[in-house]
Each structure stands twice: as C-alpha cells, then as structure tokens.
Amino acid sequence: MWWRRLRGRWRATIIAAAAVVIIVAGLSVWILTAGRQSSEVTEAAALDQVEGDGLVESPAPGVPAPGVYSYAQAGWERVGAGPLGVRRELPGTARIAVGAVSPSSFEVTAFLSEEHIEGVRYGVAGGWIREEWRRTDVTLVGIGRDDRRDLRPPPRRVPVAPEVGQTWRDEYGAGSLPVEVSSRIARADELEVGGEAVPVVVIRVESTTGGAHPGTRSETVWWSPERAIPVRWRLEMDVEGVAELTTRTTLELDDLSPVQTEQ
C-alpha cells in the first residue's frame, strides 16, 4: 500500500540522515578537542616502537643503522568522508624508527604524527631493497584503522647500488588490493645535513591502488645509498572510499646519527 512505501522511504531517509549526523558529530568533536594540529611523536615514544633487537652483526649492504631519525616536516592532510572533512596541519617534526630484524631485513615506521603512522618491512636480496609488508594507521578522534597487508610478490623499492637513469615497474597485491608502481632514478644530487654534504640520488615513485580503497601515491625521495635512508622525502597521497585521506608533506633529515636503544 502507499503508506507502506512512504514509511519505507522515511526509514531510508532517517538512516541516511543519521549517518550524516554521525560523521558531522565526529568531525565536530575532533575540531573541539584536538583543534587542527596533529600531535608530534616524541623520540622516546618512537624508540618504544622500534621493532627487532637493534644492532645486528654484519648487516647487509642496503640495511640502515637502527634507531630513530628526526626530520623537519612541513605538510598537512585532510581526513573525511565525501564533502565533509577536516584539514589538519602535520607537526613540525616527524620521526622515522628503524629496527633491524636480521642482517638482511629491517622495519621502518614513519611517525608523521600520532594520528598518522606508515610502516614497511624491507628485505634485501638480489641487489634490491624490497617491500614485504606495509602498514597504514590513520585515526580521527581516536577512531581509525591500523591497516596491515602483506605485499605479494614483494615489490622493488630501490637498488642497493642505484644508478641514474634506472627505471623499474612492479605489479603486486597488498592483501586483496591490486597495486601498480613505477619508479625511476632521475638524477644525482647532494644535500647538506648538519654541515655535512651527503650524496643522494633522486627517485620518483608513482603508484596506483585499486579495489575497495582506491588511490594514488606520488613520492620523490632523495636517497642516500651509503646510509640507506631518505635524506629528504616528499609525499603526495590520495585515498578514496568510505573514508578519504589526502596527505601532502615534505620531510628533511635533521641529523645523520639516529638515537638508538640502549643495549
């Protein structure tokens, strides 16, 4: 009957309105309680989350010194759903924690803020540093998802001995998500860190993710082959879906010597 159809429409309208109210309420709470500035992660907090035992004997070429590296950061991100969202400034200091797992593998956790953490486990084999596992943890008002996915087959991140002009392309699965990534070494350069000149190669990385969380990721990495760390890292990331994330940030290494855990 007509009143049943009308009642069904009312129910659908009420459910949709309730969903909008929940999203708006969450964004409003975040604005009132946390403002528009993300929180910086301290060295101590980053050290607490360094995976592995710290120092390992005879690390392979391509394995960086373990510890916490501090980076000056300038950036922002937007978190939201559809037209509703909040832009928040990222803190002026980011931390990257490196933990040695074995002589040929290590984990890197990039603390862009307390609310945005990126992690990768790397393995070194066949002249390449490869990504084996990736983590993305983004929260809003303490609510979010710590997404961890195995990468199969492990894509190539950077050659152990990179050369200008090298290019490579990989297709892999991040869990159930298909990913295509292409990289090239654009040029050699030199950056100064703490008064010391550091030779680097500039790597351009472009990736596209499909599936339930589609998005794009564009990176420019000023990579130190000798130290196996980024001296400068520029990230542009866009993730779509029910929840959306846009990140624009640049990190500059403050000190070549990491803060290490006590042995």
Give names to the regions the model predicted:
Residues 1-6, 90, 111-112, 133, ...:
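Extended hydrophobic/Leu-rich segments
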Residues 1-4, 47, 159:
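Short hydrophobic/aromatic-rich motifs at helix boundaries and adjacent loops
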Residues 1-2, 128-129, 195:
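Intrinsic structural disorder
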Residues 2-23, 28-29:
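N-terminal Sec-pathway targeting helices
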Residues 18, 22, 26-27, 42-45, ...:
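N-terminal functional modules and adjacent low-complexity/disordered segments of proteins
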Residues 26-123, 170-263:
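Acidic, serine/threonine-rich low-complexity disordered tracts
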Residues 105-159:
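An acidic-aromatic
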Residues 141-193:
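Secreted/surface-exposed cysteine- and glycine-rich disulfide frameworks
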